Amino acid sequence: WPMSTPERPKQFIDVLGTGHTLLQLTADRFEGICPVENIWVVTSVRYRELVKAQLPGIPDSNILLEPCMRNTAPCIAYAAWKIKKKDPQANLIVTAADHIVMDVPEFKRVIREGIDFVKSEDRILTIGMWPTRPETGYGYIKVKQEEDGAKSGAKVIREVEGFKEKPDLKTAEAYLAAGGYYWNAGIFLWNVRTVEKAYRR
């Protein structure tokens, strides 16, 4: 019997056996970064009660419901519009609810560094993960050369040259051999003003 079902997708399940679902672990990762009242969830109408049960600290007004699941862009635009009404200077972190993050302190460090960057830069920031193998299950981010990056703390924030769809094995091996390719984590950071400009273009 599958662990994840349409009635209870994997984000609502304790996949790791920690006593917390992936959704709860996602919210927990932002403790100390974002107060619970500033966490927003965009989900399908059918999962409203699951979200409320698993994240009881989130205000009902922060659970945005879609009548049916659409692609990511309209979800982000809708959430950004709602958040801007409450805080025109807000910084946004967009993440999936079903990620598994093993090194939470490092995750928090990267997110904090990213927030500091988007506070002062009119840029969209995405998180890339250093690839450890030729993985075909992830999309990739191709970055520009090192000298084109902006130093930020101990790490380098690099300009994106392009996004690559999930590759076949041969292409993934070529990415690793070439260097300058990262796994696409699907996490984005930006100021609400920046995302509004991006959607108006």
Specify the residue positions occupied by each region the protein language model found:
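Conserved N-terminal catalytic core of the sugar/cofactor nucleotidyltransferase
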Residues: 2, 6-9, 14-96, 102-112
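Conserved core of the sugar-phosphate nucleotidyltransferase
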Residues: 104-201
